[in-house]
A protein has these predicted regions:
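Mature, structured domains of secreted/extracytosolic soluble proteins
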Residues: 1-151
């Protein structure tokens, strides 16, 4: 965040982004990307690259897990049925949908999951943990299997 010069954004001091939703990659996801790209330290990554990658994970406003409409994948399609399309702070688009599992074969009472699909990479990403409240928004933590740059 510091390398990208985005401290004000994460503190709610940027116009239009006073409240944000951050689809947050794990440290492992970032480290995996760095190794794949040949970087040994964050300071080696160009500032513009850091900025783009982080902005791809941010949308304006607070979007709690329960605000995301139910949806479902459609085989061979990037965007399935339902859900919601978001535009990131970088301008890229991704589709997010929720899915509620059954509990002992009873519908609509099981756990609720979030999934994200990038229109750029056509990658589906599982959200590991939702609704992590921050001072100016909410974080939905992406699964460890996510590699930074796939969103």
């Amino acid at each position: 965040v510091e390398r990208a010069g985005l401290e004000d954004l994460f503190q709610g001091k940027q116009a239009g982004y006073e409240k944000i939703t951050f689809f947050g990659p794990t440290n492992l996801s970032i480290l995996r990307w760095m190794i794949e790209q040949g970087y040994n330290a964050v300071r080696e990554i160009p500032e513009a690259t850091c900025r783009e990658l982080i902005l791809r994970h941010i949308v304006a406003g607070i979007h709690w897990r329960d605000d995301i409409p139910r949806g479902e994948q459609v085989l061979g399609e990037t965007q399935g049925k339902g859900g919601e399309v978001f535009t990131s702070a970088f301008g890229t688009k991704f589709w997010v949908y929720s899915f509620q599992d059954t509990y002992h074969d009873i519908p609509d009472v099981g756990p609720v999951y979030l999934y994200v699909t990038s229109f750029d990479t056509r990658t589906q990403i599982d959200v590991a943990s939702t609704d992590i409240e921050t001072d100016n928004g909410v974080v939905h933590s992406l699964n460890y299997s996510y590699t930074f740059g796939q969103l």
